Curated annotation (Swiss-Prot):
Belongs to the unc-93 family. This is UNC93-like protein 3. The keyword Membrane applies. Pfam families: UNC-93. PANTHER family: PROTEIN UNC-93 HOMOLOG A, UNC-93 RELATED. Its main location: membrane. It is found in: Membrane. The keyword Ribosomal protein does not apply. Coiled coil: none annotated. The chain crosses the membrane at residues 31-51, 62-82, 84-104, 110-130, 160-180, 192-212, 251-271, 275-295, 313-333, 341-361, 392-412.
Length: 464
């Protein structure tokens, strides 16, 4: 594949001679706007999702399972939709699904939640593929225009976005903590006011999304107005779905993509219900998830700053996985619910450690896909959401039927396999990069030596 020829190119700093610095756009403005827009939208959706399994019981659990099944299947066609619409238009359209889902929570029933969940699956697929495509594109343009190292810019841009995005858990759950009250016999009050506040926040985020600039050349990218082009695009859809899975690099990182979804679903479906709620109540879910979001944000920004290439990504991901494993082992072997200060502190400490792991995974996976799949960004991020949403859906559907201990064993096994697979992938790609760089060096050295000779081929023949 053509993309394989460049898999390690961003990981090697170019010399000053090879870079042409030209005056260009400053794309940091668009990163700020995109990040704030996602913060406003997801502080509402994230907090609502955290409450689904505790407030809406089985309806909430099944609705989230339906949502992520829809998300998984729609992600298979999301790259085509984003290419046809353009990443900015896809981002704007994607916000509508989140608005509708929160609105459905004003009157939660099977007739409101199931359709809203199905549509949100589609909307989520295009907004996340659009986000990954847009952020990667402007990072590359910014690096090219300002003569910066591409891998570092991708890391910084992803670090800022994911740090701001992680703050949605902090702010959204602080709002939940302030407005939601525990009632008698496990009931809660204040949910209607909470959802109205969330809808207002989402509306602001949607409006703000209109102010990001389109990617250069994107206007002519999708053949929306051409019936022939549209038919050709639809005909190529099976190839677009299958082709990424024929790339050995994608197959090698599938366990990492799936684990990132598993660990998120564990927090949303199991941790909030089985650990936080019994210890500090339904209203305490907001406080625990606020701590989770705060550490998630800090680690997203920090990890993004240290990202420079495949080796750094592997090292950072391993650190995040070790942090999360400590919580899984604690819950499996040593945790017992207690009263008093420790009974409140333990879930908060666990939430903080899980947030560290999530912040690391988010930034590093996005940077990894951007570095390895330069020629098919939409397809790469679509695969990310396919495997993430599939893993999340499995957890939500199994949650009512599987014990916490069994889930923890699954998480530990998957974590260990993911870490080993990530190290193997890094080693394989690094060796491949060394062999290619050695070949390039030998070729360049041969050319330079030959050019330094006093006579050329033509002159040597004419001389003799």
């Amino acid at each position: 594949m053509e993309s394989r020829n460049d898999e390690e190119a961003p990981l090697i700093s170019a010399s000053g001679e090879d870079r042409k610095v030209r005056a260009g756009k400053c794309y940091t403005r668009d990163v700020h706007i995109l990040s704030i827009s996602f913060l406003l939208i997801f502080l509402a959706y994230g907090a609502a999702q955290n409450l689904e399994t505790t407030v809406n019981k089985d309806l909430g659990t099944i609705s989230l399972g339906i949502l992520y099944v829809s998300f998984m299947f729609c992600s298979m066609v999301a790259s085509l939709v984003v290419r046809l619409m353009g990443s900015k238009n896809a981002l704007v359209l994607g916000t509508t699904g989140y608005w509708l889902f929160v609105a459905a929570n004003l009157k939660p029933s099977w007739f409101t939640m199931v359709p809203a969940s199905l549509y949100l699956g589609f909307a989520a697929s295009i907004i996340w593929v659009g986000q990954g495509t847009y952020l990667t594109s402007i990072a590359r343009s910014h690096a090219t225009d300002h003569g910066l190292h591409e891998g570092s810019v991708i890391g910084v841009f992803n670090g800022e976005f994911w740090a701001m995005f992680a703050c949605h858990q902090l702010f959204g759950n602080l709002i939940t903590l302030a407005l939601l009250k525990d009632g008698k016999e496990g009931s809660t009050s204040g949910t209607t006011l909470l959802m109205l506040v969330f809808l207002f926040s989402m509306t602001l985020g949607t409006i703000l999304m209109f102010f990001i600039r389109k990617i250069d050349g994107e206007d002519g990218k999708g053949p929306v107005g051409s019936p022939v082009g549209l038919v050709d695009s639809l005909a190529s859809l099976p190839r677009m779905i299958i082709t990424p899975l024929l790339d050995i690099r994608m197959l090698l990182i599938v366990p990492l993509l799936a684990y990132s979804g598993l660990q998120q679903a564990f927090v949303w479906a199991e941790f909030t219900k089985e650990i936080v709620t019994p210890a500090i109540g339904v209203s305490g879910v907001g406080g625990a998830m606020a701590v989770y979001g705060a550490l998630d944000a800090v680690c997203s920004m920090t990890a993004g700053r240290f990202t420079s290439g495949l080796s750094s990504i592997t090292f950072i991901v391993s650190g995040g996985a070790v942090a999360q494993a400590s919580v899984f082992l604690w819950l499996l072997l040593g945790y017992r619910q207690t009263s008093g200060v420790l009974g409140t502190a333990y879930p908060l400490i666990m939430a903080a450690i899980l947030g560290i792991g999530d912040g690391i995974l988010n930034t590093q996976i996005s940077a990894l896909l951007a570095l390895l799949f330069k020629h098919d960004t939409e397809g790469a991020f679509a695969q990310l959401k396919v495997w993430q949403s599939a893993a999340i859906a499995i957890v939500f559907f199994l949650s009512p039927y599987i014990s916490l201990q069994a889930m923890l064993i699954v998480m530990l096994v998957m974590r260990d396999f993911t870490v080993e697979e990530t190290h193997f992938t890094s080693s394989l790609l690094f060796q491949n990069s060394l062999s290619r760089n050695s070949l390039r060096f030998r070729r360049c050295l041969t050319i330079k030596i030959w050019d330094s000779l006093p006579i050329s081929w033509e002159s040597s023949f004419s001389y003799w």
